[in-house]
Amino acid sequence: MPGICGPNHYEATSSLHGTNDAPLFEGEAYGNPATCTVGSELAPGTYRVTLLFAEIYWGDGCPGGGGVGSRVFDVVLEGATVLSDFDILAASGGCLASTTSEAGAPIAKTFDVAVTDGAIDIQLPASVDNGKLSALEVRGPL
């Protein structure tokens, strides 16, 4: 099913550790807010949405430096906030693109979402820096 995320995109400049699925996490859509729209003619129903996150910019040994609290955002699916004040670095333990540390791991968060308008709308508004998303998976209708 087609989709688009943005408004901005970033690619890691060093190889990633902590995952066997590095291609899923080497890039990200980011912004304030970052947004994604998945599908345009989805049948009404409940869909299982898995959002994949990995910090590749902020943290020890990464391009942005900084640390916990450098990126904090909410996750809103179809108008409902499903995660508040999410800090990938705090949740994952480190930056996957770090050149000085092997700490950190990707994070997957799964939610069931009711779709009535033909598309799954995702917003990632930030209170610090930018919201971001590495990848996503949609299954359904369930």
Which stretches of residues belong to each language-model region?
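Compositionally biased, intrinsically disordered or flexible polar/acidic segments
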Residues: M1-L142
